[in-house]
Amino acid sequence: MISRAAAPSSSIASLSSRSLRAQAPAARSFATVQDNAPPVKHYGGLKDQDRIFTNLYGHHGADLKSAMKYGDWHRTKDIVLKGHDWLISELKASGLRGRGGAGFPSGLKYSFMNFKDWDKDPRPRYLVVNADEGEPGTCKDREIMRKDPQKLIEGCLVVGRAMNANAAYMYIRGEFYQEATVLQRAINEAYEAGLIGKNACGTGYDFDVYIHRGMGAYVCGEETSLIESIEGKAGKPRLKPPFPAAVGLFGCPSTVTNVETVAVTPTIMRRGASWFSSFGRERNAGTKLFCISGHVNNPCTVEEEMSISLRDVIDRHCGGVRGGWDNLLAVIPGGSSTPVLPKTICDDQLMDFDALKDSQSGLGTAAVIVMDKSTDIVRAISRLSTFYKHESCGQCTPCREGSKWTMHMMQRMEKGQAREREIDMLQELTKQVEGHTICALGEAFAWPIQGLIRHFRPELEARIREYSKEVGGNGPYAGGWHPEARAEGKLISPGM
């Protein structure tokens, strides 16, 4: 017990309690926390006046007169006369990144052809536009070619001036007959108006535009395969270096870039880099075309602000997921080659390069494939494996053999005809393919499978156990591996 003598007097006690209260920090109320917190910025809800592709839904004609009425070819002469240095610096300041999937900074990419003493090089220089849109789920470039062809042609002139190119070659997917027809008609109109060709737009700059139609090979979407195809060779990737900027089309300096990346450039030059960079998060600037398909009420292609949330773009423009957001199973966010994301991640997912990379997926071409709970997710990824096996050019052994093995293994996983340890083997196989092929097709068939195993492994394991019960397999026969399975046609194994 504390003695009375040791106890402080009431005056001393009140003084020390006041001093303690003065030293202690003030309690932070809810309002105080909110006042000191940085404001949260929400992305999306792009206004019509900020949309670059004003004719995405074909509300007006695709002819030159209609295009000029809506702002195309406005003061293009002034833009071209500013020279390549200004164009490159403006593109770098805008933060534009490639819209074909890789997301490489466009201003930096276009500067590669302006190497030291480039003007002393007697070789012609080419801009190559990749319009070979073959990624399953992707349908943005074809809308530009069908509805806004003049925007693409004007973009070719501006981008070509930035890299001092003499001509542009547009490589169009072979199945795009209507798109090629509309685009050729638009090119003819531009030639007749003096906008391209000799003394393009009255600038003294000569620039021609040509169309080259492909023959349907998916691998020709890779830049060096595309170049090989234009040259009349088999569409197979080249080893790099040398890079196309040094030795490209016909052995001349060339830059291969996406349709959307080219088409947005003139608008950026007219409105300014600061306008474009005001949209989206840092390093993810601008607007983007999103192709939303699958189990939504209104599938569409729409232009929206970068960094918009996945749920917002689906609810705002597609009428939501079929059966409601709670009926969502998974989403492939950037075309068939990007890893699938489950609903738990999709709830708060932002749609830009860095945010999707943090979620172990990718923006890719921004082709959003929505799958509700009625989807057989294993079968969906198995179908993609079949597609990539069919489209492999066979040049690289890891891709040629790996795509075949993964296709057969996914067909087995689809039916549960496997052992649980084979899931790990399949994942290891896909990781061994990454980085060991000339082009990115190896990663394209590996990543969807990795995403499936990462997020839906319990589904694979459940199928294996279910099939094991059906055939009465235990121990060495689990998963259907019994001696008569092959003869009965119940087992699908590599090599059958």
From Swiss-Prot:
[4Fe-4S] cluster binds at residues 393, 396, 399, 439. Residues 1-30 form a transit peptide. It comes from the Eukaryota. Binds 1 FMN. Gene3D superfamilies: 3.10.20.600, NADH-ubiquinone oxidoreductase 51kDa subunit, NADH-ubiquinone oxidoreductase 51kDa subunit, iron-sulphur binding domain. Its cofactor is FMN; [4Fe-4S] cluster. Complex I is composed of about 40 different subunits. This is a component of the flavoprotein-sulfur (FP) fragment of the enzyme. This is NADH-ubiquinone oxidoreductase 51 kDa subunit, mitochondrial. It comes from Aspergillus niger. The gene is NUO51.
